[in-house]
From Swiss-Prot:
It comes from the Bacteria. Pfam families: Ribosomal_S21. One of its GO terms (biological process) is translation. This is Small ribosomal subunit protein bS21.
Length: 58
C-alpha cells in the first residue's frame, strides 16, 4: 500500500505529485488495467512465467 505523509511546510500539490510517482513506480495501475478483464489460462501461464523470469533477474 502506498502512503505519503505531508510535512508541516509541504503543500498538497507536492505531496500529490509524490503519491502519483510512488503509485506509478509500484505498478498498481498497470496491474489493475491488465486484470480488469477475464484472463485465459494460457495468458495466466505466460504472465506468471514472465514474473518468474523478472524475479530471477533481480
Amino acid at each position: 500500500m502506498t502512503q505519503v505523509t505531508v510535512g508541516e511546510n509541504e503543500g498538497i500539490e507536492s505531496a500529490l505529485r509524490r503519491f502519483k510517482r510512488q503509485v506509478s513506480k509500484s505498478g498498481i495501475f498497470a496491474d489493475l488495467k491488465r486484470l480488469r478483464h477475464h484472463e485465459t489460462p494460457i495468458e495466466k501461464y505466460k504472465r506468471k512465467l514472465q514474473q518468474r523470469r523478472k524475479a530471477r533477474r533481480r
